[in-house]
Amino acid sequence: MFAGKVVVVTGAAGALGRAVFEYFANGGARVVALDYSHELLDSAFPVKDSMHQYQEVDLTSRDSCQLVLSKVIDDLGQIDVLCNIAGGFLMGEAVHETSDATWDFLFNLNTRSIVNTSSVVVPQMQQQGSGKIVNIAAKAATQGFANMGAYTASKAAVMRLTEAMAAELREQQINVNCIMPGTIDTPRNREDMPEADHSTWVPPSQLASVIGFLASDAAVAVHGAAIPVDGLS
């Protein structure tokens, strides 16, 4: 389905990032796996396929994204799909007690990272005349929760950012959409919430399938969507 396509996956060393990488790789794409350290990438991908790239990048730095993604374009000649998977979560204090460091961390990683990657990738997609961008919001983006103000605000910003980009780019055949996962069934989440009913959580592979749909030609008419994918929660 994705033969001949170049797909960039941020946060590729995480559980969801790996699932998305595998989905597109199995579909025949050349996948560029991005994460913040070579050590993480080496751990996530101990056996590397020469068809793909594995690059260290600081997604919170526009300069770092410019350097790495410009080289990807120079090397491969195109970027057809950008999957902005990287993100973070911190349970914090009440809004009025939340530190600047927490606000900066969550907005830089969850929201500004999308701006930073898009600043390089969108001009390339405009030159190509097509492209697909898929962002990760969250079910929590639709409602504020106590002691999660910075997180929910950063993910709500992803939804609005997705809508704005979709409105700006749809006439140039560039689709921008996002998904809103509930609790993802990852080893880290199981460790953090051992008493929870894990059967209600959504597996990364199912999220990857929805992302794959949004990145496919079947979704050419979908712009600015925020799709809930929250398992049985």
Language model regions located:
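Substrate-binding pocket helix/loop in short-chain dehydrogenase/reductase
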Residues: 93-95, 99-107
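C-terminal substrate-recognition "lid" of short-chain dehydrogenase/reductases
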Residues: 205-229
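Short, small/polar-rich loop/turn modules that mediate ligand/substrate recognition or access, typified
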Residues: 170, 175, 221-224
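Conserved glycine-rich cofactor-binding loop
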Residues: 13-14
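Conserved glycine-rich Rossmann-like NAD(P)H-binding loop of the short-chain dehydrogenase/reductase
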Residues: 27-43
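Residue(s) in the substrate-gating loop at a strand-loop-helix junction
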Residues: 138
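Active-site helix of classical SDR
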Residues: 118, 154
